[in-house]
Amino acid sequence: MDLKFSHVDVLVNNLEEACAYYAQVLNARISKTLIWERGGLHVRYAIALIGQERFMLVQPLAGNLKELLDASGEGMIYRHCYSTPDIEKAYDELMAAGVQPEDENGKPLARANLQSPSGARIIWLPKRFGHFSIEILEDKALEAFVEAAFS
């Protein structure tokens, strides 16, 4: 599978405070605030860009990530994200390897349903290491999404 590292997702209690900290202490560029809401999951998030490195600062409001934040606390890196030039090929390769891609709530994801509320096509691998997850996004859509987040 053709993958490259994209970013990590970090849980925060207060998005504005976390963004201010990353901007002040790490000289990060901060995107506009974005919303993800689907299937009981509701989060506010922003991209912190430090040089070429990206962090998604995620404030969960409802759903499994809110439960994880309440149980584990702020600052937890709960996801590594990778990008690929061909998300359908990645999906097919995972299925051929016996790995059923999932949606953001851990439910089986059909190849026809790769679209997300952010506009990017995304798949998640089943969680095999506690609460840690791996996400795969399509290159072109990811880069367009990041560019729009900073416009």
Predicted features along the sequence, with ranges:
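Core segments of cupin and vicinal oxygen chelate
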Residues: 2-3, 10-54, 90, 96-115, ...
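Short acidic, gly/pro-rich beta-turn/loop elements at beta-sheet edges
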Residues: 20, 58, 67, 90-92, ...
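Hydrophobic, ordered structural segments
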Residues: 74-84, 97-102, 121, 126-147
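Vicinal oxygen chelate
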Residues: 4-13, 46-49, 68-93, 126
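Conserved short beta-strand elements that form part of the metal-binding/catalytic scaffold
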Residues: 29-71, 114-141
